[in-house]
């Protein structure tokens, strides 16, 4: 029995949501495909914003918490920012705070590593 396109669409039109769900599952099993994979290309059409997010060149280095070795973290903050002792201590005590803003990726990674080596919890945004 051969189905033409119109007969197939008419049959689909008469199916309930549960029957359509079963049909989709059967197609996934039979042909080894996923319904989620079929939806992905449609989402890629609006990928301009996603591409811009992936190409981010400036990052904020955010100190989440100082950790156990607060003195080392204060020293690291002073090295990264050039702040005085009191300002660096206030920044560390006020965590979460931005240590560095709009830094290039290399500088942000270096600052993050230096702070993490001192015992701080750090995030790049």
Swiss-Prot record:
CDD domains: Ribosomal_L7_L12. InterPro entries: Ribosomal_bL12 (IPR000206), Ribosomal_bL12_C (IPR013823), Ribosomal_bL12_C/ClpS-like (IPR014719), Ribosomal_bL12_oligo (IPR008932), Ribosomal_bL12_oligo_N_sf (IPR036235). GO terms for cellular component: cytosolic large ribosomal subunit. GO terms for molecular function: mRNA binding; structural constituent of ribosome. Transmembrane segments: none annotated. One of its GO terms (biological process) is translation. Keywords: Ribonucleoprotein, Ribosomal protein. It comes from the Bacteria. Belongs to the bacterial ribosomal protein bL12 family. Homodimer. Part of the ribosomal stalk of the 50S ribosomal subunit. Forms a multimeric L10(L12)X complex, where L10 forms an elongated spine to which 2 to 4 L12 dimers bind in a sequential fashion. Binds GTP-bound translation factors. Forms part of the ribosomal stalk which helps the ribosome interact with GTP-bound translation factors. Is thus essential for accurate translation. This is Large ribosomal subunit protein bL12.
């Amino acid at each position: 029995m051969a189905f033409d396109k119109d007969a197939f669409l008419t049959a689909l039109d008469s199916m309930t949501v549960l029957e359509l769900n079963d049909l989709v599952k059967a197609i996934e099993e039979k042909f080894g495909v996923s319904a989620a994979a079929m939806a992905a290309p449609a989402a890629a059409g609006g990928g301009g914003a996603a591409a811009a997010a992936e190409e981010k060149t400036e990052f904020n280095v955010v100190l989440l918490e100082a950790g156990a070795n607060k003195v080392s973290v204060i020293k690291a903050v002073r090295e990264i920012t050039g702040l005085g002792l009191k300002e660096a201590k206030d920044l560390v005590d006020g965590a979460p705070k931005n240590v560095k803003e709009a830094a290039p990726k290399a500088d942000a990674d270096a600052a993050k590593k230096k702070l993490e080596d001192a015992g701080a919890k750090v995030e790049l945004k």
